[in-house]
Amino acid sequence: MATIGLDKLYYAPITEDANGDETYGEPAVLAKAISAELSVELNEAILYADDGAAEVVKEFKSGTLSLGIDDIGAEIASALSGATIDLNGVVVSGSDDGGTPVAVAFRARKSNGKYRYYWLYRVKFGIPATNLQTKGDSISFQTPTIEGTIMRRNKVDYNDNHPWKAEVTEGTEGVSSAVISSWYTAVYEPDNPSPASS
C-alpha cells in the first residue's frame, strides 16, 4: 500500500562498550520531517556451475539516508555532525568534525491511515547541506538536508546477525500494540521468535 506522509523523526545517541556493542540512549526529536530517501548497497556473489548461475548471495553492505528537515538546531547539529557549541552558543564546525553514529527513527503514513515504523540502527551523518536564497516577489522556503551513511550495528541479534534496520507496519497480524506504542520510547531490540510448535 502506498505511503502518503512522513513524520516523527527521532534520533537516539549510541555509546559502545569495550567490544563495540551498542547501547542506545533515550530517543529525542531530531526535526520536523520533510522527506526521507533511503538507498541500499548490496554485496553480491554468484556461483556458476554447470554453465549457469547455481547460487546467488546478496548481503547488506551499507546504505544512504538523505533527510529533508525543517531546521537543524545547535544541539542536533552538534550531536549529528560533531560540531561544537562554544560558550556563546555559536555552532563551530571544524575540519576534523565527524559525529558519532546515532540510531534514527521515523514513520510513514499509509493511504489506509495506518503507519509503517522504522528504526535504522546505526547512521553516521555528515555536515548538513544549506540552501539559501534571497527573498524575491514570492516566498520560497529553503530547508536543510542532512545525509548519513547507514551501517549494520556491531551488536548481534538472537541469530548472530548484525541488523541494520527494524520495520513494522501498524495493524499487521501478529504485531502487538505494545510494539507500536513504545516505538519512540526506546530503540527497538529484535525479539527471538518462539520456536515453531510441532
Features from the language model and the residues they span:
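Intrinsically disordered, low-complexity segments enriched in small/polar residues
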Residues: T3, K8-L9, A18, E22-T23, I46, D50, Y115-W119, ...
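Structured, beta-strand-rich domain cores
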Residues: E55-Y121
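Solvent-exposed edge beta-strands and adjacent loop segments
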Residues: M1-A77, F125-T143
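Generic structural motif
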Residues: I14, D70-A74, R109-S111, V123-P128, ...
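Intrinsic disorder/low-complexity segments
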Residues: I34, V104-F106, E167
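Short amphipathic beta-strand/extended segments with alternating polar/hydrophobic composition
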Residues: G25-A31, Y117-V123, D160-T169
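Mixed-charge, glycine-accented linear interaction segment located at domain edges/termini
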Residues: P128-S198
